[in-house]
Amino acid sequence: MPRRGPVTPREIPPDPVYNSVLVQKLINKVMLDGKKSIAEKIVYGAMDIIREKTKQDPLTVLEKAVQNVTPLLEVRPRRVGGATYQVPIEVPPRRGLSLALRWIVRAARERKGMPMKERLALEILDAFNNTGGAIKKRDEMHRMAEANKAFAHYRW
């Protein structure tokens, strides 16, 4: 905890093509080693693929996909008298968004055998349709929270 008061979150400027902060955050999650232009090509290429396949606005598809993947609950370890309990807590909106984007990108990277823009597009479409690796990760987290519901009173 900082002694100089609360830390204010940085303002992320929207991306130039879709004028969306969400797309900019996705670009930042895809980026490796500071190579932003490559990350932009991947994300914009994926958005073009989504537009071709769904005939819908890719931004609304992405927003719905992220909304589907965003977890509501997570478990945090809490030490009580020598035992460590996994305590379920609600996920704040900023952390939920961050986790959703991270899981979508990770699931896209785990797919093999095609270019990254195609993998990312397919993962976003899967998340849009409530299937895929990122949705599996969210369901796994919700199952953990459900299994440890008995420890919910240890919340802090």
From Swiss-Prot:
CDD domains: uS7_Bacteria (cd14869). The keyword tRNA-binding applies. It holds the Pfam family Ribosomal_S7. Gene3D superfamilies: Ribosomal protein S7 domain. GO terms for cellular component: cytosolic small ribosomal subunit; ribosome. GO terms for biological process: ribosomal small subunit assembly; translation. The keyword ATP-binding does not apply. InterPro entries: Ribosomal_uS7 (IPR000235), Ribosomal_uS7_bac/org-type (IPR005717), Ribosomal_uS7_CS (IPR020606), Ribosomal_uS7_dom (IPR023798), Ribosomal_uS7_dom_sf (IPR036823). Keywords: Ribonucleoprotein, Ribosomal protein, RNA-binding, rRNA-binding, tRNA-binding. GO terms for molecular function: mRNA binding; rRNA binding; structural constituent of ribosome; tRNA binding. It comes from the Bacteria. One of the primary rRNA binding proteins, it binds directly to 16S rRNA where it nucleates assembly of the head domain of the 30S subunit. Is located at the subunit interface close to the decoding center, probably blocks exit of the E-site tRNA. PANTHER family: RIBOSOMAL PROTEIN S7 (PTHR11205). Part of the 30S ribosomal subunit. Contacts proteins S9 and S11. Belongs to the universal ribosomal protein uS7 family. This is Small ribosomal subunit protein uS7.
